[in-house]
């Protein structure tokens, strides 16, 4: 009898632990979406010191990693968690959850709080992102992005670079070196938000419905893209 009760108690405790973990993972994922909204709003509020309009308006995908560094510490030892979305025929895809780790990060000592933004600029970069896991290299794969209202005419970001990376610290955006880092799907957050495992390719190609918890994030992405596009068109008419 005692053995049966012990097994039953262990089973109940295991179930409680599982539900607690699932609840915590969901809360963390929703919080990540909300913090990513703040980063996107910052992009829109600093056009002269932020990501160039033509870069943002031509990006095929946007990846936001809020609080890559907090209080001077890189969470998990050079490890951050973020959210990605890609353009589809119907607009922006539902958010896919990512983790970024390893590599050589060109961050200055003494920086306390840093957000990371990655922009996928061409089809090759898009295919890498859709693969669920890939490594960033410096040979055409990833480069520190140009900063300011307009990208320099001498840059080759439109044709050659798969992904441009930016850091945001104390409200200021800057290009960020991120060679050797590995970007992969965050399976725990994916399951927590969607209720099941879904592949990157399915989510980012527009085959997944946007969860309500991501409505604010999707709105911010759409507004940032539209603002950049309008500004670029105005500049072209001059």
Annotate the PLM regions.
Residues 1-9:
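Bacterial N-terminal signal peptides that target proteins for export
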């Amino acid at each position: 009898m005692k053995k049966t009760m012990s097994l039953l108690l262990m089973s109940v405790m295991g179930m409680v632990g599982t539900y607690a973990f699932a609840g915590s993972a969901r809360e963390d994922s929703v919080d990540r979406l909300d913090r990513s909204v703040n980063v996107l709003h910052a992009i829109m509020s600093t056009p002269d010191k932020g990501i160039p309009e033509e870069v943002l308006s031509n990006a095929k995908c946007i990846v936001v990693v809020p609080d890559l560094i907090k209080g001077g510490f890189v969470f998990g030892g050079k490890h951050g968690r973020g959210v990605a979305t890609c353009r589809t025929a119907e607009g922006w895809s539902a958010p896919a959850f990512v983790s970024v780790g390893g590599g050589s990060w060109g961050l200055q000592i003494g920086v306390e709080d840093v957000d990371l933004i990655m922009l996928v600029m061409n089809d090759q970069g898009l295919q890498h992102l859709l693969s669920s896991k890939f490594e960033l290299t410096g040979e055409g794969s990833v480069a520190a992005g140009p900063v300011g209202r307009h990208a320099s005419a001498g840059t080759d970001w439109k044709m050659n670079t798969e992904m441009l990376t930016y850091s945001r610290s104390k409200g200021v955006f800057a290009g960020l070196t991120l060679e050797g880092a590995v970007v992969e799907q965050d399976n725990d957050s994916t399951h927590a938000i969607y209720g099941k495992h879904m592949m990157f390719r399915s989510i980012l190609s527009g085959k997944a419905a946007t969860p309500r918890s991501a409505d604010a994030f999707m709105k911010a992405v759409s507004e940032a893209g539209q603002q950049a596009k309008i500004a670029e068109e105005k500049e072209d008419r001059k």
